A protein has these predicted regions:
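Conserved, single-site charged/polar hotspot
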Residues: 1-349
């Protein structure tokens, strides 16, 4: 409990530095893990007032030679490894590593996410749909009891900071400000991928939980560079993928898709003497380097469609829908039937 209150107090310092109010926040804040650093390794931050060197050790954070329990830097900007970020930063030791966490308003965070997730060349309505999903994804991950809410990599949403921002992405964020997808009064699971291959996947096919608004559905709009593909797989790549899932290869037979999911993705796969089923079969194909699990095999040649896990919005599908005159609300309605576009304060109750 002491550690929790220490963290809350530290967050309050950052809020004050950013000119923000503590809960009930006028601008909702998110905490993004930028980097985990080994204890003893020095990190240098560029601040408006100059450079600061810090490193973690078991007792806390050493900043310019001073040992502190944790450390917060005020905004409005800072740079880590020559990449600038909006907002403030908190440094603390957790789990034997130094955590560097960017604390900033949700809408400012999205300005650094959208450019990483959808090109500025995509139509405005597609960018707006992506902005709503990125916001919804972030809000669903908020957890005040954890040391941070989100990471900055593909494991969460890619976050590139200030230098990635563009006027087109900013317009999409501002035009949808405070709007999230909701279902039955709760913030929805806002999943997205590159290309559905013509059929979206049910959420349980990949994430084991069936959600009523994430069902397999035809997607005639998904037309991207990976809508149809073929790729050779090397036996050693397949063996590595099996081992990564905890299986030991027991033969030399090439991959075979023995059963498909309702959306047409691999559901039971046999290769190298091993049979893998369910969501793990789809993960196996991705570990083998294939663009998607919507694939069949001719020996060691994979023939497939689409890119990504296939659940939720297809980004290339959103592009085509926008080009055909659909608005972002209609795009979201196609990929998330039954959901509502809600003000954040309503969906988060």
């Amino acid at each position: 409990m002491k550690r929790l209150w220490a963290w809350v107090g530290l967050l309050a310092l950052v809020l004050a530095a950013l000119g923000q109010k503590a809960p009930g926040l006028e601008a909702l804040l998110v905490r993004v893990l930028l980097k985990e650093v080994e204890l003893g390794e020095e990190v240098r931050l560029a601040l408006p007032t100059g450079e600061v060197a810090l490193r973690g050790q078991a007792e806390g954070v050493v900043v310019e030679g001073r040992l502190l329990p944790s450390w917060a830097v005020e905004g409005p900007y800072f740079a880590l490894e020559k990449r600038p970020y909006r907002g403030g930063l908190v440094a603390r030791v957790e789990g034997g590593r130094l955590l560097l966490v960017n604390v900033l308003p949700l809408e400012d965070y999205l300005l650094g996410v959208l450019p990483a997730e959808m090109p500025a060349s995509f139509p405005e309505e597609a960018l707006k749909a992506q902005a709503v999903l990125a916001r919804t994804f972030a809000v669903r991950r908020l957890n005040p009891l954890a040391p941070y809410d989100l990471c900055a990599t593909e494991a969460c949403q890619v976050y590139l900071g200030l230098s990635a921002e563009t006027p087109r992405h900013e317009r999409a964020v501002r035009a949808t400000e405070g709007r999230v997808l909701s279902y039955a009064g709760q913030v929805a699971s806002a999943l997205y991928h590159a290309d559905s291959g013509g059929m979206t996947a049910g959420s349980e096919e990949v994430f084991r939980k069936a959600l009523p608004y994430l069902r397999p559905r035809p997607d005639p709009y998904a037309k991207g560079p990976k809508s149809v593909w073929q790729q050779a797989v090397r036996p050693e790549e397949a063996a590595r993928a099996l081992r990564a899932l905890g299986y030991a290869p027991r033969g030399d037979d090439p991959p075979q898709v023995l059963e498909k999911s309702p959306s047409g993705r691999a559901w039971r796969v046999r290769l190298l003497g091993v049979e893998v089923r369910g969501p793990e079969a789809q993960r196996l194909l991705r570990l083998m380097g294939l663009p998607s699990a919507m694939a069949e095999f001719q020996g060691w040649l994979a023939l497939g469609r689409g890119a990504g896990h296939g659940v939720g919005l297809s980004q290339w599908g959103a592009k085509v829908m926008a080009e055909r005159g659909y608005g972002y609300r209609e795009i979201l309605g196609h990929y998330f039937p039954g959901t509502l576009l809600s003000p954040l304060e309503v969906a988060a109750r």
